[in-house]
């Protein structure tokens, strides 16, 4: 007798994100960490676990953990403790990892994530189970030696670097949802200046737990952990592959082959590959860290951290929406903290440009220039925010047209300087005198009498031809809206109203 398979399955996904906190020194010793430093040059007896050494908690790490927890709407535990998570692996010099087990620093939070258009474009609330402090392990590199044999080389520079592990509830359902969550979390830690969020360097590492179940069933399926995804796009692909793999096994009657294990994402093969059997909590033999006292936080300490927090991405979105910016522009601006700072500085410049004008140029031509020039962010531009504000205000006021602006912008982006001075030097001020525009229109109509006759015979699409001819005759300096109004009046044979 065969069991009828469900017609539809749904994925149940939770994510554990290891955020590398960018404190100047490690979590429990005074070693500085520098990505790319010579192997094993940023170590000391404490982070290497030598006998007789004692760990001392870095207060900056606690502050960054509180800030992130607060941004995630989590509760901050006034009294917490550290534990030893014990497992044997070559990149763990002490033989255990200092972590937090049953008393995490932060717990019971949530984050609102704007889902991709493909998933409805709605806001989804993702629960945060906990966020706890711990130390990182070292890094293994596998390579062949001169003798042709394979070796594993251990670099302990990263061992002891502070991490905040953020664990979600199993609230996510697709790869795109997980990528959207990860992107929002990265924005938050970057805005807080708590982590650079560089996944390619391991500053933000995501382990995803994936299971599937028939739609409508409460009980979870067997959970599989997926690791080693160095971008959000890779994460989405890995999850979607794993969902399809599990569903195929169930539908083919091989559901018992789905076991609790850790799988790695093979980017070249575009599939997940089994790594090892997944350990349970009992395998780690947690017990309280005897060398570190309980962490007791006063209300004043927590309040001071919260008071020093900068504006978060959600707050910036709300502020920009209130300015009337289109959602697409808001999304581009909030993607980068440097971009937000630059936009705000341009907007508050003495020229007082409109928000929409600044956003339009910044998210369009200027972002394209950054990409083509391979610049990391807008802070590298020769064009200052104040100069951009002046440029946009000139367009707002009709001193130059958008076309002239497009012609001028490349030079401003390459050399910086004042838009007003550049316009004056080139004699490009927009012509907005009604008498000059009227004379210009008269000249164009006189020079194109045949087309004018066709227009008045019903071929009204020729208006675009006349507008283009007027702008060309003025060298692009004529005020387009004024040209349109005066031209229309002339074509219709009605009195000119330029009020």
Swiss-Prot record:
Gene3D superfamilies: 1.10.10.410. GO terms for cellular component: chloroplast; glutamyl-tRNA(Gln) amidotransferase complex; mitochondrion. Its EC number is 6.3.5.-. It catalyses: L-glutamyl-tRNA(Gln) + L-glutamine + ATP + H2O = L-glutaminyl-tRNA(Gln) + L-glutamate + ADP + phosphate + H(+). It is an enzyme of class 6 (ligase). InterPro entries: Asn/Gln-tRNA_amidoTrfase_suB/E (IPR017959), Asn/Gln-tRNA_Trfase_suB/E_cat (IPR006075), Asn/Gln_amidotransferase (IPR018027), Asn/Gln_tRNA_amidoTrase-B-like (IPR003789), GatB (IPR004413), GatB_Yqey_C_2 (IPR023168), Gln-tRNA_amidoTrfase_suB_CS (IPR017958), Gln_synth/guanido_kin_cat_dom (IPR014746). It comes from the Eukaryota. It holds the Pfam family GatB_N. Keywords: ATP-binding, Chloroplast, Ligase, Mitochondrion, Nucleotide-binding, Plastid, Protein biosynthesis. SMART domains: GatB_Yqey. GO terms for molecular function: ATP binding; glutaminyl-tRNA synthase (glutamine-hydrolyzing) activity. It is found in: Mitochondrion; Plastid, Chloroplast. GO terms for biological process: glutaminyl-tRNAGln biosynthesis via transamidation; mitochondrial translation. Belongs to the GatB/GatE family. GatB subfamily. Subunit of the heterotrimeric GatCAB amidotransferase (AdT) complex, composed of A, B and C subunits. Allows the formation of correctly charged Gln-tRNA(Gln) through the transamidation of misacylated Glu-tRNA(Gln) in chloroplasts and mitochondria. The reaction takes place in the presence of glutamine and ATP through an activated gamma-phospho-Glu-tRNA(Gln). NCBIfam families: gatB, PRK05477.1-2, PRK05477.1-4. This protein may be expected to contain an N-terminal transit peptide but none has been predicted. This is Glutamyl-tRNA(Gln) amidotransferase subunit B, chloroplastic/mitochondrial. It comes from Ostreococcus lucimarinus (strain CCE9901). The lineage of its organism: Eukaryota, Viridiplantae, Chlorophyta, Mamiellophyceae, Mamiellales. The gene is GATB.
